[in-house]
Amino acid sequence: MRVAVIGMGLIGGSVLRALAAAGHRVIGFDADPATRGTARTAAAEAPPSARWQIAPSVSAAVADAELCVIAVPLPALEIVLDEITGRGYRGLITDVTSVKMPVLDLVERYLEGGSQRLAGFVGGHPMAGRETSGFTAADPRLFDGCAWVLGLEPGRTMLGDWLDLAALVTELGARAVPATAAEHDRAVATISHVPHLVASAVAEQAADPLAAALGAGSFRDGTRVAATRPDLVAAMCGGNADAVRPVLDAVIESLTAARAALDARDPIAALRPWLVPGHRTRSTWPATAGEPLPMRPSIPALLDLGRAGGWITSVSTDRTTVTAVRPE
């Protein structure tokens, strides 16, 4: 497949490298000239069978592409879409943005009034972020075993487009997870965005030199994502504010209950029941995978699979069957 990757940070650069390693014809572009230079040098040093090209512009990158992967921050997405549609690109488009409703709302504007400036769009989000960033952090194995959400909107998403992307991401080692944009945003608020905020709040307390000197496993594991660039976290959480607010409120309410337990006559006894639900949930995560089974794909069946915590591991060449896994 001929693929254009627009934006070559950690995720975009990893997509670029992974697709090239899988034998696809890939061309990348980044607005930063230094990033383009670094990526061009890395391409020359890659094995001949896993090399990619670097384009001088968005238009040049998508000129011959069948698929365009947009891997830019949410605030830059509209600029890229304008350039792509202005070029007359008619291939499939996906993105890797960590929030999906704002992206879906933006894409809808390109489809209003029957203009069909976009031929096909399937939102995406590989759950493979790290605290490192930039093309130098890109890794072609980044997606091995990761959940890659692919947006599936009844009445909007073409099933064939979704299956084509599911086939591609599973080829890269990911698990394709079907979900609507709203379902995705609620879920990532819980398991990604609010944990970033909590980690930053805890990490701030280690400004004390003695506390920093004593930091070990609990501090390291509980604050790892606080090392993520603040502008990236702000874009993630602020872009998903509607979903983040109720989850953050629930966490604050829970911590307030823990604070009250510390004032009890017996704080140890008071804290114990507060700790049990979190311990139980974390001890059973991740869920044990069930047996992979063939499934006839349809939008309702795929969404039911995603809501049950399941995923797709492969797609047949003729797109008539997928291999589905549900948690036990």
Language-model-derived ranges and their functions:
Residues 1-55, 60:
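NAD(P)+-binding Rossmann beta1-loop-alpha1 motif at the extreme N-terminus of oxidoreductases
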Residues 24, 89, 174:
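Short phosphate-binding/catalytic loops that engage adenosine nucleotides
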Residues 55-98:
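Rossmann-like NAD(P)-binding element
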Residues 80-136:
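Rossmann-like NAD(P)(H) cofactor-binding subdomain of soluble oxidoreductases
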Residues 142-227:
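Internal alpha-helical scaffold of NAD(P)-dependent oxidoreductase catalytic cores
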Residues 214-286:
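Interdomain hinge/lid region at the active-site interface
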Residues 255, 262-263, 267-328:
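NAD(P)-dependent dehydrogenase/reductase Rossmann-like domain
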